Amino acid sequence: MSELLDLSFLSEEEKDLILSVLQRDEEVRKADEKRIRRLKNELLEIKRKGAKRGSQHYSDRTCARCQESLGRLSPKTNTCRGCNHLVCRDCRIQESNGTWRCKVCAKEIELKKATGDWFYDQKVNRFAYRTGSEIIRMSLRHKPAVSKRETVGQSLLHQTQMGDIWPGRKIIQERQKEPSVLFEVPKLKSGKSALEAESESLDSFTADSDSTSRRDSLDKSGLFPEWKKMSAPKSQVEKETQPGGQNVVFVDEGEMIFKKNTRKILRPSEYTKSVIDLRPEDVVHESGSLGDRSKSVPGLNVDMEEEEEEEDIDHLVKLHRQKLARSSMQSGSSMSTIGSMMSIYSEAGDFGNIFVTGRIAFSLKYEQQTQSLVVHVKECHQLAYADEAKKRSNPYVKTYLLPDKSRQGKRKTSIKRDTINPLYDETLRYEIPESLLAQRTLQFSVWHHGRFGRNTFLGEAEIQMDSWKLDKKLDHCLPLHGKISAESPTGLPSHKGELVVSLKYIPASKTPVGGDRKKSKGGEGGELQVWIKEAKNLTAAKAGGTSDSFVKGYLLPMRNKASKRKTPVMKKTLNPHYNHTFVYNGVRLEDLQHMCLELTVWDREPLASNDFLGGVRLGVGTGISNGEVVDWMDSTGEEVSLWQKMRQYPGSWAEGTLQLRSSMAKQKLGL
């Protein structure tokens, strides 16, 4: 679009003249194309008569063009320097510089000159191939964009300087020059003046007159013949300028300015980083946008630029709980509903007090040819009401092949409104090898689609695929139950993979001084090094059965940018080798008793929020930090032993392989 020209200053008559020129140019081009086709056909005819291909074997006694026998000893034969074929003297064309070519090669050169191909072959390497007529035609079709910060006064002044705005203005001006015509503004029955009534219908009038004039000009050019099929209404300008009309009211030239602006007005919270800088100083100071300005200027704050702020999953869950608590207090109801956040991260949060009832009917079949699991969701029976007072439910079914709970692994049916016995009859597919299917668990969950995305959990059911026979498509019906807690021993296995890490604490006495290492703020304390080696058997988050994973770390209780560390993204693998080290300075040995290292694995999504793949927490696992009970001090098993080994042997590496958690919600401690 950068090649388009600004032709807004042209009048409709001038545009019609330009379009007629373009039409003649199109006719000339078609005639020239016909001439070029004729020349190319002549060349093809010469080749068909006697030319041979380079892939064939040529006899030394035959001319490649006329195929005449040359005899055993023929001094007239020689090789054409264009095609390397043997040709006789009669099939040569002498050139001005004394050299010669065969008839076919000479005809090809002549054709290249006559058609102008030599010019276009060079032009295509230097310029984008687009003729001037195409650019002008596209510019005439293109409607100029309105400046975002152009005021009404500036636009009026610009239009006055550029000339006519709409075609009927000349006719109106001629009518105004006549002394017999009086300009009156009568009152209507509604009490409004005709000018006020006209201004109210200004949007529709402007759209009709503009579209009609544009259609007329393009119909004359013949560029859009299909527009002729559409019946266009008569212009209001023609109606108002007809003789005998009473109380004619003419609209001022600024009518285009007062059209309703469809551009969205941004609230302060919706400004982009660069827009925030352009707000008044009082607004900038109130929002404290020093960090915003540093983000909008490249190189001003490199650390902030590198931080691609994906939301932490626990932080999102915490905010969602607070939001639900506030809404329940305001409504005076103790019933808490679950929002779309729970749809993404189903293991966290409160699932409400709805009593789960009903069952789901379905059938399963595995297609060997396509390597796909076919899930036929048929119907649900006797579901619970999401809104008990109004006896209303809008249910839909969502499925996962656990442990994969990513967006790519989610399948959903349509929403059936105002029913507790929905009939779906829909097919959901999962492309997965049969060998891997036995390690998965198919989960059905039924949800009520509420207003504003506040979905309510209605029940779920699971199928262990290792004990399911898929050779025949049989109908099944399972009862729905409530959410199984992650702490419940009867919970389904959720293997998320393993993370291999090594920890080392270097006391302050052994920490190197000087060099490029930053000095800690406290002036004392050692150094905690976290070596993220690799991950094994991660959950596939992308369609191809892979993940673009990275590890993010926090040294709790500090959950801020100073404590945040990230590894590079390892693409298209479920067994990534990170080989990356996190370093925390200014850490004292006695402080490790009250700290916890949280490592989470994420799948990188460039245009959306990242997918949670699993995580671990390394600490003492007492549930207490600095005398306070905290949720994040919940380490168990290998997480505790690896942390204690690192504390027990300062200066040496402590390595361990940790099972990734499927949820970073608080675990039940064996106290």
From Swiss-Prot:
Every RabBD domain range: 4-122
Modified residues (Phosphoserine): 201, 204, 217, 221, 274, 289, 488
Keyword annotations of the record: Cell membrane, Cytoplasmic vesicle, Membrane, Metal-binding, Phosphoprotein, Repeat, Zinc, Zinc-finger
Gene Ontology cellular component terms for the protein in this record: endosome; exocytic vesicle; plasma membrane; platelet alpha granule membrane; transport vesicle membrane
Top-level lineage group: Eukaryota
Presence of keyword Lipid metabolism: no
UniProt cross-references to Gene3D superfamilies, sorted A to Z: C2 domain, Zinc/RING finger domain, C3HC4 (zinc finger)
The name this protein goes by in its record: Synaptotagmin-like protein 4
Species the sequence originates in: Homo sapiens
Source taxonomy: Eukaryota, Metazoa, Chordata, Craniata, Vertebrata
